[in-house]
């Protein structure tokens, strides 16, 4: 089984009266595999920035988003995927929203692993 894609779905309410309300927006992360399984995670952070970190296309010097970094990897090897994400995000940091985006992928991987093994997570 290999990761074929990572989709970042941004959900945002039309308006929020209290700007400190944590329900304004969220990023849903979907990890897809070549055998049709999908895992779902979420990022409760700056959804616009997290989405860019997930979706950034390949560019010069090996700078690209998480979807490009993990594509082709074994989703059941969660430690291996984490290592790839840590190595591949060096250009834009491994703190703040970047680590939040990686955590969203992590949650999706655990969801996917539970589905693949027929076990609850």
Show the residue positions of the predicted features.
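Metal- or metallocofactor-binding catalytic centers and their adjacent structured scaffolds
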Residues: 32-116
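Structured beta-strand/loop patches that form or line metal/cofactor-binding pockets in enzymes
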Residues: 1-40, 44-47
